[in-house]
């Protein structure tokens, strides 16, 4: 992953929430390569590089997020629960909403309270997709929450709106990145790797839907 950014661009001190997750780990390592001082905030400490300062905590708790944001220039908010269920039991819905939406609110409050200059939010392409889409760009409108198919899409949509609404308020600049499918070295979702291996070996005999559909 070659990010067109520099240490001067993101600032010398960066925090990655969800830093022990797949995207968070790769991002933290890339920031180290840029020469940044890197912190992570996660329920588990960062693994693999002693140069990273790990804050073990919950993004829903200001008492955990606030100290991690002290002296930080840029926060990369990747922490989230990826739950694609539609008919989840109430306790699961509360947990996903709590982490993905209320956790994002907490991160925004902490950024403002601690004077963080920049907040970059990992959103999802799913926030604007409620049917076939061709050639969409940043101007594509949000899908209606009611039409989004799962908890993850619904909560990411609400969280992204919170982040973008906070732009240029209390000295904070914000941005949202909407990746599609994300996979690569170190990914724990074995299904994606198996899918690609089967496809490469010509083992798929049935295609449902258009064979020209892409996820970019």
Report each predicted region and the residues it spans.
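Conserved glycine-rich Rossmann-like NAD(P)H-binding loop of the short-chain dehydrogenase/reductase
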Residues: 36-47
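Conserved Rossmann-fold NAD(P)-dependent oxidoreductase catalytic core, especially the SDR/UDP-sugar
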Residues: 102-152
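N-terminal Rossmann NAD(P)H-binding glycine-rich loop of SDR-like oxidoreductase domains
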Residues: 3-8, 12-34
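NAD(P)H-binding glycine-rich loop region in Rossmannoid oxidoreductase-like domains
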Residues: 57-99, 110-113
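NAD(P)-dependent short-chain dehydrogenase/reductase
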Residues: 167-215
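Active-site segment of SDR-like NAD(P)-dependent oxidoreductases
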Residues: 82-85, 125-132, 180-183
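Active-site Tyr-X1-5-Lys
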Residues: 147-175
């Amino acid at each position: 992953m070659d990010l067109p950014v520099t240490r001067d661009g993101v600032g010398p001190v960066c925090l990655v929430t969800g830093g022990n997750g797949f995207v968070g780990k790769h991002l933290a390592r890339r920031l180290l390569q840029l020469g940044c001082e890197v912190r992570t905030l996660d329920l588990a400490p960062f693994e693999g590089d002693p140069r990273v300062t790990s804050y073990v905590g919950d993004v829903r708790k200001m008492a955990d997020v606030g100290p991690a944001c002290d002296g930080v220039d840029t926060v990369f908010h990747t922490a989230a629960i990826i739950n694609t269920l539609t008919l989840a039991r109430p306790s699961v819905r509360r947990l996903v909403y709590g982490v993905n939406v209320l956790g994002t609110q907490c991160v925004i409050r902490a950024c403002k309270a601690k004077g963080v200059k920049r907040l970059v939010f990992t959103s999802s392409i799913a926030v604007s997709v409620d049917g076939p889409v061709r050639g969409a760009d940043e101007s594509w409108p949000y899908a209606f929450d009611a039409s989004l198919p799962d908890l993850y899409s619904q909560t990411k949509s609400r969280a992204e709106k919170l982040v973008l609404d906070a732009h240029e308020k209390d000295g904070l600049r914000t941005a949202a990145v909407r990746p599609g499918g994300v996979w690569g070295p170190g990914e724990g979702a074995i299904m994606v790797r198996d899918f690609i291996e089967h496809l490469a070996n010509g083992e798929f005999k049935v295609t449902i839907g258009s064979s020209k559909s892409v996820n970019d």
